[in-house]
Amino acid sequence: LFATLDTTVRKVVFDNLPFLLSDTVGFIRKLPTQLIESFKSTLDEVREADLLVHVVDISHPQFEEQIDVVKQTLQDIGAGDKPVYLVFNKVDAYTYVRKDDDDLTPATRENLALDDLKKSWIARANTPCIFLSALAKTNLEKFRSDLYGMVREIHAGRYPFNNFLY
């Protein structure tokens, strides 16, 4: 069902700003009842987080449904108000079906080129988002910069007089 059930926590330091990064398993819809107890610690990690980095495999045919499942799960566990940074990974593996110019049938998500999909998501997302490829190392510096800015903002709000870090 999953590659791992355990949450991994690592200390990360960006430009002298330390923070803890937890990697949890992905959420699935209709989790079998007998597995819910196994995921309690993961759900606790999510509830206690200051920022959620939601990594989405954009090459998966149902990535939008997966996003909806995660949003609903966050609502269900009382973490729907957490700030989320939406990371669309695997842009190098994204494919679409090109429509002929004379095709009059309505376009669907499967007909959107990556640039059009980006515009669509950026326009409708109520959260910051980025499109990258971890494998091809595309847009990783922007991801790092964005994440640093978000963590710095949280840190500055929590420790307003501790500005020696940034």
Predicted segments — roles?
Residues 23:
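Conserved active-site aspartate in kinases
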Residues 1-19, 28-38, 59, 63-64, ...:
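Switch I (effector-binding) loop of TRAFAC-class P-loop GTPase G-domains
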Residues 34-60, 72-79, 133:
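Inter-motif core of Ras-like GTPase G domains
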Residues 33-39, 100, 115:
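Short alpha-helical interface patches
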Residues 3, 61, 65, 72-166:
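C-terminal-of-GTPase-core extension/linker across diverse P-loop GTPases
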